[in-house]
């Protein structure tokens, strides 16, 4: 029988890796909101690793800055989410956060074992900063968000623009809110996603995961965009990409996905469905024109 004070021969003072991980596990605070794709992938990694974390919801998409700490813009000059705080230190940018958490809490590992597979993982993740994330926002604003923003007063829209510190994001939003489905930026954004999904499908025809045989940060980083496009009722556009769809279902069936993504919901879900369905015929024509 285990008696008080017994440690079964283990000297925890000689387990610095264990004690360091245990010490930091309770110190994670995530600034995020429900439907942010960048925040979704960070939550997904936190749940896959079963790390305890404190939630601070800040809906920056709606101009909610009341809960941001005074030095938030020092942590992320763009003023966006997510930002994660660990033991007093702040880390911004979701892809950097994924790599940081993998370094800080390496078990269970979400990097493939071989150097080649790890390189492939990072090449997939690089696509996000090379255009996928900007394209995702363009599609979302053109299809759905423009209706939400245009319902506001001119004064509130100007205030919204004034709060945006990312010049590219502000300029794109101004074009996309004004032009909607006729935005000159929409065709290229849809083409970016069509190429991405087709490339993913081809890769997944040869391996179960994007970086090979191992579920990795690449899968976590990119799955949120399939969900985002599907939230606009656009899934029929890639119904023939069998391997992509099977991959998505495998991830969606993981307990971590339920707790990190599904359970947080989306306060704009109904708007996405209604405006997405209305936009589908024109979007489908643009999607096909890029074939």
Residue map of PLM features:
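Cationic, amphipathic, low-complexity segments that mediate targeting or membrane/lipid association
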Residues: 1-13
């Amino acid at each position: 029988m285990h008696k008080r004070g017994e440690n079964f021969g283990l000297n925890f003072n000689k387990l610095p890796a264990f004690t360091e991980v245990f010490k930091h596990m309770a110190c994670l605070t995530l600034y995020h909101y429900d439907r942010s794709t960048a925040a979704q992938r960070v939550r997904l990694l936190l749940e896959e690793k079963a790390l305890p974390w404190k939630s601070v919801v800040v809906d920056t998409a709606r101009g909610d800055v009341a809960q941001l700490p005074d030095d938030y813009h020092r942590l992320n000059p763009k003023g966006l989410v997510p930002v994660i705080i660990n033991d007093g230190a702040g880390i911004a940018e979701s892809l950097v956060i994924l790599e940081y958490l993998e370094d800080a809490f390496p078990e269970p590992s979400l990097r493939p074992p071989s150097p080649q597979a790890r390189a492939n993982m990072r090449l997939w993740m690089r696509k996000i900063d090379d255009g996928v994330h900007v394209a995702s926002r363009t599609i979302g604003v053109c299809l759905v968000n423009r209706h939400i923003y245009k319902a506001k007063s001119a004064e509130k829209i100007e205030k919204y623009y004034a709060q945006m510190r990312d010049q590219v994001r502000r300029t794109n939003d101004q074009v996309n809110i004004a032009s909607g489905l006729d935005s000159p930026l929409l065709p290229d954004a849809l083409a970016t996603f069509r190429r991405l999904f087709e490339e993913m499908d081809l890769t997944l025809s040869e391996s179960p995961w994007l970086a090979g045989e191992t579920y990795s940060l690449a899968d976590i980083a990119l799955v949120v965009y399939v969900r985002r496009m599907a939230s606009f009722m656009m899934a029929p556009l890639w119904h023939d990409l069998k391997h992509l769809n099977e991959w998505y279902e495998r991830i969606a069936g993981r307990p971590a996905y339920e707790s990190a993504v599904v359970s947080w919901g989306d306060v704009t879900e109904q708007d996405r469905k209604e405006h997405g369905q209305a936009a589908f015929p024109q979007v489908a024509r643009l999607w096909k024109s890029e074939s």
